[in-house]
């Protein structure tokens, strides 16, 4: 009986088991590489026994993603993989390009500026260790209080449509932080949407498999994070792609 099953905990196969973190990047702000270096230190301090590897994907940036910044990053974090796409395709395409370079048992993706607290990232990894195939960030009121009206409406509309049209029980698919094991990674790699709603396609595909364990985890936004507004028409266009 599937309902009575529980995930099988993930056991470290070796010391310093690697976790890949895919970081899509578009027009990053000045100093982005230094922040990544600092976040890497925080993660390794909190995740004893893991080797953290960043996979940074440039999604056709017109500014910010400079040779100097990349060199500074890779000099400090030599294991970092840089995927330098010259054409902007969208976050979904960028994440898939990054995942293609990942060979770790556990992995996750989030925005390059790490909008959520490191403790929230560690919580995602905790549930992957517990055996869940996909772990989804569930945003709380602190997140929505920092959204523009347009983006807030789009987020609530997305959750409503996820439930009504797609039958998803995990409706907060747009959190921008998700973890997965190899099984979950295969669902992500099979998505096709290039932009806003690739997260929804990912969770929808994973939810169709009754043997896949999905877990929602409450996450906290960093207080200093400023969330950008959404361009007009993006949500509607991506909804058409999904449907």
Model-identified regions with their sequence ranges:
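Hydrophobic targeting segments
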Residues: 17-23, 39, 43, 52-57
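Short beta-strand/loop segment that forms part of the nucleotide-sugar
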Residues: 50-61, 83-85
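Short aromatic/hydrophobic "clamp" motif used to bind/position activated sugar donors
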Residues: 107
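Hydrophobic helical membrane-anchoring modules
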Residues: 1-19, 30-31, 167, 191-243
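A conserved acidic beta->alpha catalytic loop
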Residues: 29, 58-67, 114
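Acceptor/aglycone-binding surface of glycosyltransferases and processive sugar-polymer synthases
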Residues: 87-101, 118-192, 196, 224-233
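Short, well-formed alpha-helical segments that are part of the catalytic scaffolds
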Residues: 4-7, 28-45
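Conserved donor nucleotide-binding strand/loop of the catalytic core
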Residues: 67-101
């Amino acid at each position: 009986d599937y309902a009575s099953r529980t995930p099988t905990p993930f056991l470290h196969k070796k010391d310093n088991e690697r976790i890949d973190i895919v970081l899509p990047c578009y027009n990053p702000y000045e100093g982005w590489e230094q922040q990544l270096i600092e976040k890497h230190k925080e993660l390794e301090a909190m995740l004893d026994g893991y080797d953290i590897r960043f996979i940074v994907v440039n999604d056709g940036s017109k500014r910010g993603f400079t040779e100097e910044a990349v060199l500074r990053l890779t000099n400090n974090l030599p294991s970092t993989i840089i995927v330098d796409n010259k054409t902007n395709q969208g976050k979904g395409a960028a994440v898939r390009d990054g995942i293609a370079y990942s060979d770790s048992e556990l992995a996750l993706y989030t925005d390059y500026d790490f909008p959520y607290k490191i403790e929230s990232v560690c919580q995602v990894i905790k549930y992957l260790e517990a055996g869940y195939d996909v772990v989804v960030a569930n945003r709380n009121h602190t997140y929505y209080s920092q959204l523009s009206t347009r983006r807030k409406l789009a987020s609530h509309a997305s959750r409503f449509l996820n439930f009504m049209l797609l039958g998803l029980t995990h409706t907060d698919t747009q959190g921008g932080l998700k973890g997965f094991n190899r099984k979950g990674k295969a669902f992500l790699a099979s998505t096709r949407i290039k932009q806003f709603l690739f997260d929804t396609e990912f969770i929808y595909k994973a939810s169709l498999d009754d043997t896949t364990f999905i877990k929602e985890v409450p996450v906290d936004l960093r207080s200093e994070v400023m969330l950008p507004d959404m361009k007009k028409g993006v949500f509607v266009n991506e909804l058409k792609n999904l449907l």
